Amino acid sequence: AAMAETRPAVRAARWHNYNAIKDTIADAQCDPVQAVADIIAFAIWNAQRVNDPYKLCRIHESGDFFSLTYFLAWIQVAREHPEIKFYAYTKQLEYWLGVHKSGCIPDNFYLTASMGGDEDYLLDQHPEVFKRVAVVVYTEEAATQHGFEIDHDDSHCFGDKPFALLVHNNQRKGSDAAKALAARRRQGSWTGYNK
């Protein structure tokens, strides 16, 4: 959200994509999952025409899966592109659990549970499913106290244990998160992820 505020073109592109996908879901005559998967796959193909082929694709820089259809479409895209590792952070644990139970998550699709959502109760109920859990902390000391390694480069998204992320990017003015980030900036410490 913070990037969208500082970069209007990014915000406009994200809303365009969101609306295109929602319209496709609403207008799909047969299979909305495949219709959305086709849009996503076309966007990947189009981006690769002018860039190097993707080996890694992070789903959402910010945001989450807004519907089960959208979630399933990404799984379909991963199935169709086994040469690409897809990964995402999500609080949509019920979607993940349902698809996991059906055995339909491909090997190149990595999900990390983002702690702090309404479905966190599922984390303790299904630790065999939710092995990768990300917890946002304000300081390196807090991560150490909880026994978490800090992920600075998304590499922990491919492991099998919980990890911490330091609070980053822009935070609401006056919030504890903003104060923690400002303190790290004053110390010359790490304050953000490279995209």
What are these regions (language model features)?
Residues 1-195:
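Class I S-adenosyl-L-methionine
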